Structure formats: C-alpha cells, structure tokens
Amino acid sequence: MKNYARISCTSRYVPENCVTNHQLSEMMDTSDEWIHSRTGISERRIVTQENTSDLCHQVAKQLLEKSGKQASEIDFILVATVTPDFNMPSVACQVQGAIGATEAFAFDISAACSGFVYALSMAEKLVLSGRYQTGLVIGGETFSKMLDWTDRSTAVLFGDGAAGVLIEAAETPHFLNEKLQADGQRWAALTSGYTINESPFYQGHKQASKTLQMEGRSIFDFAIKDVSQNILSLVTDETVDYLLLHQANVRIIDKIARKTKISREKFLTNMDKYGNTSAASIPILLDEAVENGTLILGSQQRVVLTGFGGGLTWGSLLLTL
C-alpha cells in the first residue's frame, strides 16, 4: 500500500519585469556594489500587473501539464504566502478555482519565509494518513506591495515569484526526518501588513506600519545560531548531498556553512537573480536545480530544505529525491 509521500514534479513562475540594482540606485541612495556586496543580490523580479494568486495559478497549471495529471486528480492544494490577494478567500482557493480542481480542499499557510517547508511537512502528513494521494504545494509571494520603496535597508532585498511541487503517494519513504520550530516571543523582529482596526468601538493602538519592518541584525544573528543548530539536528557534512536554504542573503548562507562545518559547495544559491522571495525561494531554487540537472528526482539524493523567517519560524526537512 502506498502510504509514503514523494515529490514527483517541480515548477516555478516569476514575473517578466526584472529590476536590477542599477535601477534601484536611481530610485534611492544605494548602488549595485552596496547591494551585491552585502546581500549577493544583483536583480529581482517585480510584478507590474499580476498578484500572488496569478503567480501561483501559473505554477499549478505548469505542474499539471508537466506531470500529466488532471485537475480532478488533485486532493489538496496548500499555498504558503504572507502576501495574499485578500484576507479571504485564500490564495489556495483561488488557485483551486482557476485550475478547476473541484475535488481538492485548499488553504493557505502563513509562516513567512519558512512557509514552504511548513506546508510541505503538512502535505506529507496528509498523504501519510492514507486518505489523500496527490496534492499541490506552492510558495508564492508579491512582497513588492509590502515594501517601503524609499528604504534601502529593505526594498533592495525582496522579489516576487512563485514555485511549487506535486506531491504523491509512494511505496518507500522519501521524507526521512524533520524539525520545525517557532519562537513567538521574538515576533517583533520581522513584521509586515499590520491591519488597523477601523471599528468605531475600537480604542486600541491604531498607529502601525503596513510596510515591512525588520530588525536586520537580530534576524541575521537568529539565522546563524538557531538555523545552524536546526540543520545539525538532522545532518552532517557526511550525511547530506545538497542543502536548499531560504534565499535571504548570501552572507547568511556563507556563515551557516562555516558554523555547521558542511561544505559550502553543497549549499545551492540563486538569490543573485531573484532576491528574497520569501515562501517562494526554496521551491524556485529546487525547480532550477532539477531543471539544470543538479538534483534528479528519483535519484535518492539526500537533500535538506531549510526555511527561516518571521514569527520567528524556522525548520528543516530531510528528503531523498
């Protein structure tokens, strides 16, 4: 009986509009050298007309086309995002309607840059239950609508995009281990999208920023210490082939590699082309690695997927492909 789960297909979709560091230097007090030397980012994709659901719809459509699955075969759709089109309906429900997956239930997961890892973990448990065979897990963001485009400390970091996987029942284990974590006591280190209560009865605080606010140093230190410990709880240099970390900053990845004593060559990166796409960053990286042959589905390569971000949330999955 097929009671395990595996990733059987990957796909990504990013907006056509490419914004370079040089373009940003014309909008704010920054430069290509300043941005690239501190982050590893050279350019990012920014939407001009699309919203998060549009990006995720394209990913879902591509996953069906590439896998040969019919929409009616999809049992569930999970979308990881903190930049939905609306508070309701969920992006996942919009995607379900757009592709005609009438048999699927659908909901969003809000775990910031850890969202895809959280969602993929939940999807595996759904398949393990034996009740569901096939699902779509997508990470999608349009962070450009949450940024203060005059603040060089945050505006230069983020990009828009979406990517995801088809997860199916399997006869052998592919999800080998995991560790998901959170620390709500540090919630204020990274916030965005504060919703102001406009009720005439509400007497509480109404002055807060809707744009992204980040305690950069705190987040950097959190990633180096806590995320490194999380990874080491699952693997060592000898027991992993590749690591796909959330693409926040190349300096973070460099330091995590040193902290964990895992070969830097095993850490895949692509933030130079996309910037920080939050919940989309890991599946975008995964799909690119499959496309260029670095990762091969069905190869039994041992891979770690690690997310970390607002909440604070962080977590890793150890998989065989």
Swiss-Prot record:
E.C. no: 2.3.1.180
Recorded GO CC terms: cytoplasm
Pathway: Lipid metabolism; fatty acid biosynthesis
UniProt keyword terms in alphabetical order: Acyltransferase, Cytoplasm, Fatty acid biosynthesis, Fatty acid metabolism, Lipid biosynthesis, Lipid metabolism, Multifunctional enzyme, Transferase
One BP term from GO: fatty acid biosynthetic process
PANTHER family: 3-OXOACYL-[ACYL-CARRIER-PROTEIN] SYNTHASE, BETA-KETOACYL-[ACYL-CARRIER-PROTEIN] SYNTHASE III, CHLOROPLASTIC
HAMAP family to which the protein is assigned, alphabetical: FabH (MF_01815)
Protein name: Beta-ketoacyl-[acyl-carrier-protein] synthase III
Gene, per the UniProt record: fabH
